[in-house]
């Protein structure tokens, strides 16, 4: 089943990125990483016309809870800060800025939608904040030079 495979692939990729980021962090952790925690941010539509996709955010939160129950990643708990953007690009921008500037997340994880991802990619690139597993059907996000 393709959905199950892609979820496993996504989970492995997330863990690999987080392990790589935390393994090299030592005492100079950088944004979102401490000796005990890794903060990652997400905006996803829990309300509005595409609220059915909120299930993705709830499933991902449950996955990170399972990882944390097993000791986390390199002894650090993963803290997913997931905010409702109602599939509204202005709300996505507002929440993404909060996640980066106030919550100091390591990365933005699995943001959903072409219009919402289009609204935040330049900001994230300028702030040098990784955007991991942006969910979009747009081919434009397949160009790593323009969308690193």
What are the functions of these language-model segments?
Residues 1-38:
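Short, low-complexity disordered leader/linker segments with a strong preference
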Residues 28-36, 41-61, 83-89, 112-113:
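Extracytoplasmic "Venus flytrap"
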Residues 35, 104-148:
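Extracytoplasmic ligand/sensor domains, especially the bilobed periplasmic-binding protein
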Residues 44-47, 63-64, 68-71, 100-103, ...:
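Sec/Tat-exported extracytoplasmic proteins
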Residues 55-69, 91, 131:
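Short, solvent-exposed amphipathic alpha-helices that sit
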Residues 71-87:
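Short helix-loop-beta-strand segments that form the rim/entrance of peptidase-like active sites
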Residues 86-106:
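Short, well-structured alpha-helical segments in soluble
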